[in-house]
């Protein structure tokens, strides 16, 4: 199991931090199913965090959050036997570095690899990778029998952010809809910087539809 206790502790800490912040969060009510969908219009970061704290918080080493699309952690990425069992054909590593992740790691499995060298920091610009990552995921799922693992160290922030961007770019989901779709299957908690970047993408896509 991936560290579900860690995820819950992180969510609890962030919730307390939000409440104690000098900038008061906007209060929302209701369950995950009652949260707004298309007509949000544009939630702020605190409202998104409230949505993230609601509903499923547990996770496995990998969870199928969209048909053929698995969101997971480094342990799953290193488990060749499990990758073969799941039929994974592509791996997108959102925590790529000289020490973590290479195409050679999947030699003999027929897996195509894309590494994104991203830092799980609110100051890191993940948005520059949104389109490239979404295109890679789309190509993987477009081929017959294609299945992709999108992962980072824990599978809740960097990789989750790229999966949300993919759902928004290729399936025209709003950010709220994308979060709800993923959280039906796995707890996630992108950092605040990533949430702001996803909000900017959401605004751009919504404004493009309205133009």
From Swiss-Prot:
GO terms for biological process: negative regulation of ERK1 and ERK2 cascade; negative regulation of MAPK cascade; negative regulation of transcription by RNA polymerase II; positive regulation of cell adhesion; protein dephosphorylation. Its main location: cytoplasm. GO terms for cellular component: cytoplasm; extracellular exosome; Golgi apparatus; nucleoplasm; nucleus. It catalyses: O-phospho-L-tyrosyl-[protein] + H2O = L-tyrosyl-[protein] + phosphate; O-phospho-L-seryl-[protein] + H2O = L-seryl-[protein] + phosphate; O-phospho-L-threonyl-[protein] + H2O = L-threonyl-[protein] + phosphate. It comes from the Eukaryota. Its EC number is 3.1.3.16, 3.1.3.48. The active site is at 152 (phosphocysteine intermediate). Keywords: Cytoplasm, Golgi apparatus, Hydrolase, Nucleus, Protein phosphatase. It is an enzyme of class 3 (hydrolase). Interacts with HSF4. Belongs to the protein-tyrosine phosphatase family. Non-receptor class dual specificity subfamily. Inactivates MAPK1 and MAPK3 which leads to dephosphorylation of heat shock factor protein 4 and a reduction in its DNA-binding activity. Inhibits MAP kinase p38 by dephosphorylating it and inhibits p38-mediated apoptosis in anaplastic thyroid cancer cells. Can also induce activation of MAP kinase p38 and c-Jun N-terminal kinase (JNK). This is Dual specificity protein phosphatase 26. It comes from Homo sapiens (Human). The lineage of its organism: Eukaryota, Metazoa, Chordata, Craniata, Vertebrata.
């Amino acid at each position: 199991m991936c560290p579900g206790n860690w995820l819950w502790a992180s969510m609890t800490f962030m919730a307390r931090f939000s409440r104690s912040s000098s900038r008061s969060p906007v209060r929302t009510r209701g369950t995950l199913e009652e949260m707004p969908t298309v007509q949000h219009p544009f939630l702020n970061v605190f409202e998104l965090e409230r949505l993230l704290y609601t509903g499923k918080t547990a996770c496995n080493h990998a969870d199928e959050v969209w048909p053929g699309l698995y969101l997971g952690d480094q342990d799953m990425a290193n488990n060749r036997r499990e990758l073969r069992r799941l039929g994974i054909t592509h791996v997108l590593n959102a925590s790529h570095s000289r020490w973590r992740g290479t195409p050679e790691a999947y030699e003999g499995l027929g897996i195509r690899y894309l590494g994104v060298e991203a830092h799980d920091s609110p100051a890191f610009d993940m948005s520059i990778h949104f389109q490239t990552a979404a295109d890679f995921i789309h190509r993987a799922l477009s081929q017959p029998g294609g299945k992709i693992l999108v992962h980072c160290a824990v599978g809740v922030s960097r990789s989750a952010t790229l999966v949300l961007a993919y759902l928004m770019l290729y399936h025209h989901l709003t950010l709220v809809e994308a979060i709800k779709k993923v959280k039906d299957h796995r707890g996630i908690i992108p950092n605040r910087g990533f949430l702001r970047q996803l909000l900017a993408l959401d605004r751009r896509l919504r404004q493009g539809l309205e133009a």
